[in-house]
């Protein structure tokens, strides 16, 4: 519907501008992130996700701040993305191609073919924008071409009373090229933080330009400006625009092209006006993605699944690493980073080290890690709400990083603390992260970890603010986390007491099973400050309410005994619906429950966000991981296909309204929006899909001393081939029946998985 996947790449072709929603695609090179949709550029951010926005659409704004208006000799207006002008226009041969290396837009109308191409080079905060018209008719075409870009050039979020334009000094210079430059001044008199953006365009056929947005718009608006051109050369403290006018005369079969570049660095900008240079840079960019797609390859016999896993999952992992959760506020979530980068390790280990060190300098000296930390590090703005799960996720990331890289030297590096200038080693930071959870003041009356202001489920944000509430999920995470720490310390010959961590892990496991496993044979979610269990066999509102996450983590962490797996499977089946697996059920809020949080207060409608929806990350990602432990290959494969968006029998586009290439945050059941997808790419589900394929289904798990391999595959898949990399070496795996071959040699050595006790194949490396 609306288009089709492009073979052999993470590409999609769209054949109409009239999509039911904004269908987005991301371009990023670490120096800049650009989001586009069918109507062109949406926003651009330097050094994502923590730096300034170069331009952005405001909320509910449909059309791009950077587009080109075309006026014909019949005084008819249209744009290079067709709209926002005459909506009666019916273009022909619409073709929007999202390719990893560039975005292409083309259509035909009134004897013209209009083409736009948007490109980010491999390095640098630059956006190259090329627009071409070809006269495919039989008569001359006399056209006015009016490009316009409204720059923003400021932090994504500023004070409500503040204005971005107060800090901009914009100039225009005309030479071989016309160059607009906007200098961002510092509101805090820090001259070192000044920035300058450059917008460069051609001068051939140029007839007018304008830098004052106010004067350019006149009595109109941004979509229909008066287009007054005063030819002023400077404006400051008022909003700028980069507006130009060209006059083109095209004979039949003649084409004309306009190149524009928007950049934070004026070096080599004009090189992109040379098409040979541009094509070369585009080819270089394509090679980068070809290498990305070749790092891990699977061949299962399910061609649609293989295509999506081989191209779209690694592509979106790259995006997520730069988007974080897509709120361009300059912060990253601790739990979000930990989960995303644990999956990114399969394709990009170097970025993970930088993230780890940044996270640790934002760690409090008692071991606690913030809900969100500044992407720029310790001295930035942080979200210091009292959620307690960040460190639990971080410990697993640290173990996985060491397993994927063997970079044990990182443990000796030193970094400061959020609340102290003292420096300690990474290993000390890691130990304190774990010991935070086992300190007496952070253990509740049932011997479980206290929940404070929240765990993974953000909307349970008032269950423990008085200091009594406990989290079952965090306790289960620490059953694992304590073992991860012990494994690391054993590996580096740590001379301190390691046994105490393993003992406490067993103690937590015992307490969870004693107090949180209820008479209905599933695990409760949390214990609140009122002394009541929530997500239990009988909640305070009278409902039996199964919450998947603590049940799945009971299996993942090795807390649940294997004889109780049948109860976890039954609980999951009770959460299943026609959209996948719900996070919990029934919804909260009809009868408000005190001391739980916003999700149970009546302020979050049923089936909104996490509230009893198919919340992809926790509903299906954690379930997939648990199913791999339980050896449920058929169910695991089905759940992975529920996470992914391409299968029209599971997530029909006519219902979700989101693109079939985009992994979403959740599928909602709100009245009038049944099965509607919410927030493309802004989710930990992408990381769950990556790990789901390679770590949980194919069972490839790097460890501190080698590879554990424990496939969990459907019964009908009897010959799977895998190409992967580990420690910069390529490995070829074949899974035939229940046998595993590595580089054509059958793997026979086994050992016990230290977390869940399963027997697994082992390849010492």
Indicate where each model-derived feature is located.
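Aromatic-rich carbohydrate-recognition surfaces in CAZymes
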Residues: 336-337, 341-447, 471-479, 608, ...
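Catalytic cores of carbohydrate-active enzymes
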Residues: 146-148, 163, 370-371, 477-599, ...
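Polysaccharide-binding surfaces and accessory modules of carbohydrate-active proteins
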Residues: 105, 119-227, 274-291, 295
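Extended, loop-rich substrate-binding clefts of extracytoplasmic carbohydrate-active enzymes
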Residues: 75-124, 219-244, 307-314
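C-terminal capping/lid segments that line or modulate ligand- or cofactor-binding pockets
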Residues: 2-5, 11, 18-41, 329-332, ...
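Active-site acid/base region of carbohydrate-active enzymes
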Residues: 300-308, 350, 359-366, 393, ...
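Beta-strand-rich recognition/accessory modules
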Residues: 126-130, 202-281, 465-468, 481
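Non-catalytic C-terminal accessory modules of carbohydrate-active enzymes
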Residues: 42-55, 61-106, 112-114, 609-612, ...
């Amino acid at each position: 519907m609306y288009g089709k996947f492009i073979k052999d790449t993470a590409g999609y072709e769209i054949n109409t501008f009239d999509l039911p929603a904004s269908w987005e695609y991301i371009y990023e090179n670490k120096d800049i992130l650009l989001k586009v949709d069918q109507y062109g550029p949406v926003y651009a951010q330097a050094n994502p996700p923590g730096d300034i926005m170069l331009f952005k659409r405001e909320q509910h704004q449909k059309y791009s701040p950077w587009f080109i208006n075309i006026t014909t000799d019949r005084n008819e207006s249209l744009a290079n993305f067709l709209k926002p002008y005459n909506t009666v226009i019916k273009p022909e041969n619409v073709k929007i191609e999202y390719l990893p290396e560039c975005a292409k837009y083309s259509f035909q109308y009134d004897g013209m073919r209009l083409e736009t191409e948007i490109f980010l080079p491999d390095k640098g905060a630059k956006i190259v924008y090329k627009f071409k018209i070809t006269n495919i008719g039989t008569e001359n075409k006399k056209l006015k071409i009016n490009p316009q870009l409204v720059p923003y050039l400021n932090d994504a979020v500023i004070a409500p009373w503040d204005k971005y334009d107060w800090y901009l000094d914009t100039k225009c210079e005309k030479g071989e090229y016309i160059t607009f430059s906007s200098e961002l001044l510092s509101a805090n008199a820090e001259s070192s933080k000044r920035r300058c953006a450059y917008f460069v365009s051609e001068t051939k056929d140029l007839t007018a330009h304008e830098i004052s947005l106010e004067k350019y718009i006149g009595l109109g608006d941004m979509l229909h400006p008066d287009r007054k051109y005063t030819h002023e050369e400077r404006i400051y403290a008022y909003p700028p625009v980069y507006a130009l006018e060209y006059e083109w005369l095209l004979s039949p079969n003649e084409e004309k092209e306009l190149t524009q570049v928007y950049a934070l660095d004026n070096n080599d900008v004009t090189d992109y006006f040379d098409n040979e240079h541009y094509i070369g840079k585009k080819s270089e960019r394509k090679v980068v993605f070809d290498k990305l797609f070749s790092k891990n390859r699977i061949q299962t016999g399910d061609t649609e699944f293989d295509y999506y896993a081989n191209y779209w999952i690694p592509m979106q992992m790259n995006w997520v690493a730069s988007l974080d959760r897509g709120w361009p506020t300059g912060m990253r979530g601790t739990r979000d980073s930990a989960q995303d980068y644990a999956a990114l390790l399969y394709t990009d280990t170097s970025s993970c080290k930088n993230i780890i060190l940044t996270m640790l300098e934002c760690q409090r000296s008692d071991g606690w890690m913030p809900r969100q930390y500044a992407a720029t590090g310790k001295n930035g703005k942080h979200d210091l709400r009292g959620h307690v799960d960040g460190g639990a996720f971080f410990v697993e990331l640290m173990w996985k990083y060491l397993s994927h890289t063997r970079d044990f030297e990182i443990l000796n590096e030193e970094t400061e603390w959020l609340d102290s200038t003292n420096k300690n080693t990474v290993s000390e930071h890691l130990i304190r992260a774990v010991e935070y959870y086992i300190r007496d003041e952070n253990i509740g009356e049932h011997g479980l970890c206290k929940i404070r202001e929240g765990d993974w489920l953000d909307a349970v944000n008032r269950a423990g603010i008085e200091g009594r509430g406990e989290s079952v999920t965090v306790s289960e995470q620490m059953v694992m986390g304590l073992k991860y720490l012990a494994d690391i310390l054993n590996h580096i010959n740590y001379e301190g007491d390691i046994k105490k961590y393993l003992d406490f892990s067993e103690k937590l496991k015992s307490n969870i099973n004693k107090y949180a496993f209820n008479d209905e044979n599933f695990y409760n979610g949390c214990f609140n400050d009122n002394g009541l269990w929530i997500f239990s066999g009988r909640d305070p509102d009278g409902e039996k309410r199964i919450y998947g996450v603590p049940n799945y983590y009971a299996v993942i962490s090795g807390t649940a005994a294997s004889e109780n797996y049948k109860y976890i499977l039954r609980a999951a089946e009770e959460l299943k619906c026609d959209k996948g697996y719900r996070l919990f059920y029934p919804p909260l809020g009809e009868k408000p429950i005190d001391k739980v949080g916003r999700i149970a207060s009546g302020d979050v409608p049923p089936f909104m966000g996490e509230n009893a929806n198919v919340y992809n990350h926790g509903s299906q990602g954690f379930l997939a991981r648990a199913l791999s432990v339980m050896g449920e290959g058929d169910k695991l494969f089905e759940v992975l296909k529920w996470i992914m968006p391409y299968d029209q029998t599971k997530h029909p586009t006519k219902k979700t309204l989101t693109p079939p290439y985009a992994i979403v945050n959740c599928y909602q059941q709100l009245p009038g929006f049944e099965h509607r997808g919410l927030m493309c790419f802004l989710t930990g589900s992408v990381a769950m899909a990556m790990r789901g394929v390679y770590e949980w289904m194919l069972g490839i798990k790097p460890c501190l001393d080698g590879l554990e391999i424990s496939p969990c595959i459907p019964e009908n898949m009897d010959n799977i081939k895998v190409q992967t990399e580990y420690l910069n070496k390529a490995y070829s795996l074949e899974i035939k029946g229940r046998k595993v071959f590595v580089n054509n040699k059958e793997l026979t050595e086994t050992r016990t998985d230290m977390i869940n006790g399963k027997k697994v194949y082992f390849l010492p490396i």
